[in-house]
Amino acid sequence: MSNISLIVGLGNPGSEYAQTRHNAGFWFVEQLADKYGITIKNDPKFHGISGRGNIEGHDVRLLLPMTYMNRSGQSVVPFSKFYQIAPEAILIAHDELDMNPGVIRLKTGGGHGGHNGLRDIVPHIGPNFHRLRIGIGHPGSKERVSGHVLGKAPSSEQSLMDGAIDHALSKVKLLVQGQVPQAMNQINAYKPA
C-alpha cells in the first residue's frame, strides 16, 4: 500500500465561501497544515495554494485548488503529474452530501459519486486515489442541493463536522505511513460523541 504523499482539500476560494459546507475539504487540509506547522502559500503555477512539510517523518505535499470546485482538476492534475505523485499516493478530502454531519469515511477508488470536484479529476488521473468523505447531510430535494452546499451549517451541525475532522486528523499518521487499511478501519468506525 502506498504512503500518502499528497493531501488535497476541495472547496471554493474566497471569503464568501470559507464557512460553507462545500469547503469541508479545505477545512481538513487547513487544520492539518496548522497541526503540523506546514506553511501553505499561493502557487499560481498550479492554480492553488500549496505547501510541503514533514508529517510523522514523511515528506508530504498539501494542495488547495483555487479554481472553484467544478474545475478542481485544473489544479490537482498538473500538480500530481509535475511532482510525479501516483493516484495511489493521493488523498482527496471533500464534502459528502450522502452522509450526515458527524459521519466521516475513508474510501479507496470508485467513481465521482456526483461530486463535481471529483468529476473534474477522475477522468484525468483515474479512480485509484483515496477519498476522505466528510458528511454534510442532504437537504432532502435535488433542487435545494446548491443552496445547501453553498450555505453555512448551523452550529450544531458544524460541531459534528468539526469532531469528525478532528478524528480524521489524528489518523493522518497512519496514512502517511502507508497503513491505509488500518486508517480506514479507525476513521470509518468514528461515532460522534
From Swiss-Prot:
Site feature: Discriminates between blocked and unblocked aminoacyl-tRNA: 12
Keyword annotations of the record: Cytoplasm, Hydrolase, RNA-binding, tRNA-binding
Coiled-coil spans in chain: none
Residues that bind tRNA: 17, 68, 70, 116
Major site of localization recorded for this protein: cytoplasm
GO cellular component, one term: cytoplasm
Localisation: Cytoplasm
Active site location: 22 (proton acceptor)
EC number: 3.1.1.29
Biological-process GO terms, alphabetical: protein quality control for misfolded or incompletely synthesized proteins; rescue of stalled ribosome
GO MF terms held by the record: peptidyl-tRNA hydrolase activity; tRNA binding
Enzyme class per UniProt: hydrolase
Reactions the enzyme catalyzes: an N-acyl-L-alpha-aminoacyl-tRNA + H2O = an N-acyl-L-amino acid + a tRNA + H(+)
Subunit architecture: Monomer.
Biological role stated in the UniProt entry: Hydrolyzes ribosome-free peptidyl-tRNAs (with 1 or more amino acids incorporated), which drop off the ribosome during protein synthesis, or as a result of ribosome stalling.
Family as reported in the entry's similarity comment: Belongs to the PTH family.
Protein name in the entry: Peptidyl-tRNA hydrolase
Lineage, top ranks: Bacteria, Pseudomonadati, Pseudomonadota, Gammaproteobacteria, Moraxellales
Encoding gene (name): pth
